[in-house]
From Swiss-Prot:
GO molecular function: small ribosomal subunit rRNA binding; structural constituent of ribosome
Origin organism lineage: Bacteria, Pseudomonadati, Bacteroidota, Bacteroidia, Bacteroidales
Species of the source: Porphyromonas gingivalis (strain ATCC BAA-308 / W83)
NCBIfam families: S6
Protein name, per record: Small ribosomal subunit protein bS6
GO cellular component: cytoplasm; ribonucleoprotein complex; ribosome
Coiled-coil annotated spans: none
Length: 117
């Protein structure tokens, strides 16, 4: 199993429920195919660097997971078929990227603990 990270952008016209349903669809697909989801982050509504499909904003979602390489083809096929996804990028993390991601997650958890206290 390899470590992967995927970021996808959903169209900004979705309601919160529709956005959550779309994210659940893709994470459910990963779990169904035997992937282990390591981290999931909702980056919220952000401005795009350039217009895509005449839209200047989008809902960003990050998912880090461990899976076999054949799962990626199925995931990206579903991204292409879903009209709610306007862009996506999936890449395999090498050992350095995986270490950096783990460090970033632990640092984020520590800052959230400080905010709660």
């Amino acid at each position: 199993m390899n470590n992967y990270e995927t970021v996808f952008i959903l169209t900004p016209v979705l309601s919160d429920a529709q956005m959550k349903e779309a994210v659940d669809k893709f994470t459910g697909l990963l779990k169904q195919e035997g992937a282990v989801i390591v981290n999931e982050e909702n980056w919220g509504l952000r401005k795009l660097a350039y217009p895509i499909q005449k839209k200047s904003t989008g809902f960003y979602q990050l998912v880090e997971f461990q899976a076999n390489p054949d799962v990626i083809a199925k995931l990206e096929t579903n991204f292409r078929r879903d009209e709610r996804v306007i862009r996506f990028l999936t890449f395999r993390q090498d050992k350095f990227a995986a270490e950096y991601a783990a460090k970033r997650r632990s640092l984020k958890a520590k800052t959230e603990e400080v905010k709660e206290a």
